[in-house]
Curated annotation (Swiss-Prot):
Gene Ontology molecular function: nucleic acid binding
Organism: Yersinia enterocolitica serotype O:8 / biotype 1B (strain NCTC 13174 / 8081)
Xref: Pfam families: UPF0102
InterPro entries cross-referenced by the UniProt entry: Restrct_endonuc-II-like, tRNA_endonuc-like_dom_sf, UPF0102_YraN-like
Transmembrane regions listed in the UniProt entry: none
Entry's family note: Belongs to the UPF0102 family.
Record-given protein name: UPF0102 protein YE3728
Length: 117
């Protein structure tokens, strides 16, 4: 399986898990020059921007640990653009940033993993 196919597989797995948890799927793989948003979901009135990470094992800290500060900043920039295209911003629109981490066969959903602050 190619790297891209692997990413799509785990993004679909995350999407279905989150849908079963009650979130509503809105978009996937939204890409801008500054970054990419793996999944955009809706949880009631809140927009949820989801970073999906997969690691085969926890040797270097696992999937959740791979969401570095610079990765968070790229996701924040992409979400800022996405919101602006809809005449919205973090100050006026309920949003959160979740991480869906898959390490080996272990799934970990981290709601509100980091902030736009």
């Amino acid at each position: 399986m190619s790297h891209r196919d692997t990413g799509t597989h785990y993004e679909n797995q995350a999407r279905h898990y989150l849908e079963r948890a009650g979130l509503v799927f809105k978009a996937a793989n939204v890409t801008y020059q500054n970054g990419e948003i793996d999944l955009i979901m809706r949880d009631g009135d809140t927009w949820v921007f989801v970073e999906v990470r997969f690691r085969r094992n926890a040797l270097f800290g696992g999937a959740a640990a791979s969401v570095t500060y610079s990765k968070q900043q790229r996701l924040l920039r992409a979400a800022t653009i996405w919101l602006a295209q809809r005449n919205a911003c973090f100050a006026t629109t309920p949003c959160r940033f979740d991480v869906f981490a898959i390490t080996g066969s272990e799934l970990e959903w981290l709601p509100n993993a980091f902030n736009a602050d």
